[in-house]
Amino acid sequence: MKSLDQFVEICQEAGIQVMFMEMPSANSWNMARHRAVADYASSRNISFIDFNMKDRMKETGFDWMTDSRDGGNHLNYSGAKKISVWLGDYLAKDYQLEDHRKDSRYQRWQQDVSAYDRIVLGTVHQTADES
């Protein structure tokens, strides 16, 4: 806990907002862990997002039957996409992060995503201009 306290202190002194989150995990997460993290986060004014909570699952559209690849420990592509889209919207809104998808300086990243989608998923990635 001492290392975590030091990490949080360094971030807060540097003006870096700390956020904790827990990905959906039916097998390795429980309410005792949730409460411990929530209490720690609350005591230090840190945001905590637990994607295992029913309200968060409803917001993301997450479904254990279609969005997990091994019965609840890891997300599949569909689950990762749902969580990533929700998290991206949250970070843009609550942390004022800029959307760089149309920024030419990030073109290489977009090309890498498109290549990944073609090779691994057999799909074509939609660019920010097309969405």
What positions do the PLM features span?
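Residue-identity detector for glutamine
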Residues: Q6, Q12, Q17, Q96, ...
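Conserved, well-ordered alpha-helix/loop/beta-strand core segments that scaffold catalytic motifs
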Residues: M1-E59
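C-terminal regions of proteins
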Residues: R33-R108, L121-E130
